[in-house]
Amino acid sequence: PTRRSSDLQLLDVMAGQVSDNTVVLKEVGDENKTVLEAFGLEFSPATDADIAVIKKQLGKECENLFYKAWRVENSATRKNFKTFCKGKGRIAKKLFWHGSRTENWWSILRTGLVLRPTNSVINGKMFGYGLYFAPRARKSVGYTSLRGSYWAGGHSNYGFMALYEVVYGKPYDVSDNAGLSDMNYEKLQKRAPGC
């Protein structure tokens, strides 16, 4: 993106954060609640078992980037996930990475990943609007604010990624985005029914 486009995206993020703060003040209301409690968020240190899984998923190419991990639960997104999975019989779940710029993480943690975020800088949408996950950590590192990140052009000494449990259906594997930049569910079903 051009410098002007990047500046406008950053201003949109900042405006979203100001409106988020206004919402926080309204939603917390109860002086006994923390902001995290008001938004249904629970943060806890990752257990040794969690860290072992994370390091395994990072693989040899990214294990040196690991610094610290937290377990984050958003009660609303967890409920939606369980509701979606319920009654579907046997479904496959896999762990996939999602990387994003540092300034996007409060919104992601608060609302979950959304198709068209209004107050986040979008680093790319190779296949149109969607929720993007990667099986390899290296791909997601490229979308963080970490110095040298490929897609986000990060300049920070740190970056954040999340390891998500994702319901995994019938995959549609592609090697490039030729003709797929405006992909949506209806078009996908015509091209690859059942995906």
Regions found by a protein language model. Give the residues of each.
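Short, small-residue-biased leader/transition segments that mark boundaries at the very start
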Residues: 2-5
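Extended, H/D-rich, highly charged conserved domains that either
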Residues: 7-93
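Segments that shape or occlude catalytic/ligand-binding pockets
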Residues: 27-30, 41, 71, 79-195
